[in-house]
Amino acid sequence: MGLEAAIIDNEVMTIRALAADDDRTVDARVAGPSALLVAKLHKLGERREKAPARLMDKDAYDVYRLLVTVPTQVLATTLDRLLEDDLAGGVTCQALGYLDEMFGAFDSVGAFMAGRAEELVGDPAVVSAACAALAGDLLTSVAGDVGPTSE
């Protein structure tokens, strides 16, 4: 579950060979950042509920990197579109619930995990706080009532 968003949020990209002397390319559809965020949040949320031992700091850090790298309004605009889609709407709403639960506060599990992933190279507290701030901004920017804390 959670991959439905990639059917809506995707684009064609040209993928090139890694070797400088290899000129092969292929055009392929790849998931957009909002679809990646939805999928990653489902992975984390489902593992938290069913297999906590399989939770990986790297997955939470991937959420952090998406929140930092992609402008909030870009994510929000696409997430609004996904919420309105018959196929992707339900899983997108659930993903935003996971975002709120797991990243919505500096001491929530996802924010803590993302910070822990930065332990040897940065400041975990800054990453955890940034997760909470960015998640809050995104949830505020997305139209409509989403997630478990909406009334």
Predicted features by range, described:
Residues M1-E151:
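Compositionally biased terminal segments of proteins
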